[in-house]
Amino acid sequence: MEERGDSEPTPGCSGLGPGGVRGFGDGGGAPSWAPEDAWMGTHPKYLEMMELDIGDATQVYVAFLVYLDLMESKSWHEVNCVGLPELQLICLVGTEIEGEGLQTVVPTPITASLSHNRIREILKASRKLQGDPDLPMSFTLAIVESDSTIVYYKLTDGFMLPDPQNISLRR
């Protein structure tokens, strides 16, 4: 793979730096990944995320990495990408277990900063995406490190008791 030295923006993304991604990793050091040089750039889901025209290349890149992790490693079902233009976010909506309700996953690079107000806005938007107003407001934050490690945190509005089936007895 050849590293590109130009900084022309990719359609649908703003502010790309050398390597196709800006501001991801340690101190602005971008991965040497350029969509036109990699198989990712031709993947239908990546192209669908680019067409949303939300955020920059970093956001599309981390959303695509989380999509691949959910589909390939975690075996989620029917994961779709949804753009939230008012929040400038790409969200993933799918089901962890077939037949269960939709869950919202919000991919974010580790360098991003989230305020309480921003989290509240995302909670409200995720309720609309889940389609059931009776469910408690929640979403899963997928934090992507520069080495592609992904950590998932479930955020809810208030405290949630764990499922009894997920609690192991300790003596």
UniProtKB/Swiss-Prot annotation:
Residues 1-35 are annotated as: Disordered. The modification Phosphoserine is found at residues 7, 168. Signal peptide: none annotated. The keyword Protein biosynthesis does not apply. GO terms for cellular component: nucleolus; nucleoplasm. Disulfide bonds: none annotated. Changing residue 76 to G: In PCH2F; Almost complete loss of tRNA-intron endonuclease activity in vitro; may affect protein levels. One of its GO terms (molecular function) is nucleic acid binding. It is found in: Nucleus; Nucleus, Nucleolus. One of its GO terms (biological process) is tRNA splicing, via endonucleolytic cleavage and ligation. The keyword Phosphoprotein applies. Widely expressed. Highly expressed in testis and uterus. InterPro entries: tRNA-endonuc_su_Sen15 (IPR018593), tRNA_endonuc-like_dom_sf (IPR011856), tRNA_intron_Endo_cat-like_sf (IPR036167). Residues 14-30 have a biased composition (Gly residues). Belongs to the SEN15 family. Homodimer. tRNA splicing endonuclease is a heterotetramer composed of TSEN2, TSEN15, TSEN34/LENG5 and TSEN54. tRNA splicing endonuclease complex also contains proteins of the Pre-mRNA 3' end processing machinery, such as CLP1, CPSF1, CPSF4 and CSTF2. Non-catalytic subunit of the tRNA-splicing endonuclease complex, a complex responsible for identification and cleavage of the splice sites in pre-tRNA. It cleaves pre-tRNA at the 5' and 3' splice sites to release the intron. The products are an intron and two tRNA half-molecules bearing 2',3' cyclic phosphate and 5'-OH termini. There are no conserved sequences at the splice sites, but the intron is invariably located at the same site in the gene, placing the splice sites an invariant distance from the constant structural features of the tRNA body. It is linked to Pontocerebellar hypoplasia 2F: A neurodevelopmental disorder characterized by progressive microcephaly, cognitive and motor delay, poor or absent speech, seizures, and spasticity. PCH2F inheritance is autosomal recessive. This is tRNA-splicing endonuclease subunit Sen15. It comes from Homo sapiens (Human).
